[in-house]
Amino acid sequence: MSGVRVLVGTKKGAFILTADGARDAWSVDGPHFGGWEIYHLKGSPADPNRIYASQSSGWFGQVVQRSDDGGKHWEAVGNEFAYVGGPETHQWYDGTPRPWEFTRVWHLEPSLADPEVVYAGVQDAALFRSDDGGEHWNELAGLRAHRTGSAWQPGAGGLCLHTILLDPTGGEKIFTAISSAGVFGSDDGGAHFAPKNVGLSSEYLPDPDAEIGHCVHRIAQHPARPEVLYMQKHWDVMRSDDGGEHWHEVSGNLPSDFGFCIDVNANDPETIYVVPITSDSLHYPPEGRLRVWRSRTAGDEWEELGRGLPDKDCYVDVLRDAMAVDQLDPCGIYFGTTGGQVYGSPDGGDTWQAIVRDLPAVLSVEVQSLA
């Protein structure tokens, strides 16, 4: 029977949750790297035994870890992330220039075809690539070199490149999302990038419809329809039907259009999921009721999903990297909370169960579907 491996990054280590295809009984392994913040860990689509992890500490800095046996053993790999070329500064919160400084790896995105190739999104925002399993990293400097680079400003969590979408057709398109500069896309494998923010509007900007400056929390894509992109912005849920060239709002009847995560059902490119959060100052679900909302119409209409989720007194957050889907049918949906719970649904969101409780605050959730 097929199986599922859920990779959970938390503020105090990584945990690996496994189940067979029924997804009704789970084993929990961890913590790996106990005491360290694990911003993200993700498995290679080309080799399920290859997993990359971003290990970070305010005291000891950044370490990239690699496993070749499904997370049983780990090896520290290359950890030098050197910016090349300009610009020399970006804008700070108050608008003053500030030198670019590497802090941590926010997101790791393995190649869809080659387990040795992996991309890293970092803070301060830049995109790096390794062709040797993470041993050496080279900046794809065309992103920061865009004429707007010196005007990028951080969001509340810093100036971070937190999302990387690789071309599911095998081509050279790359989409990245930066808080808070916006979405940038490349058609040539990362040599050059252009903003993809037309249609976004942010009231906190001097020009709400500016080319850059939008606090994009997450973007998602389905491989069967790569021209359609979905976005959870600081406020607003958005959709693009033309590869990010234009966006329009699809928040509809959601109880709040603020949130962090968004994902797409593996078996239906028009079925998407979000977790509404009350506001940018109240980081918990509306009325303390933890709910996932699902749209089967690409965002035109939404329905509340709560069977098995807390109905009251729930004041947790679900962060941008903390939701993922498996590739089984029916599709499994998984998310983690800042309260340390990881919830899973084996039936596309109709019902939920707590896979594990009382972990440290969950920073990221990724899923591997195993043969």
What are these regions (language model features)?
Residues 1-371:
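Extracellular glycan-interacting surfaces
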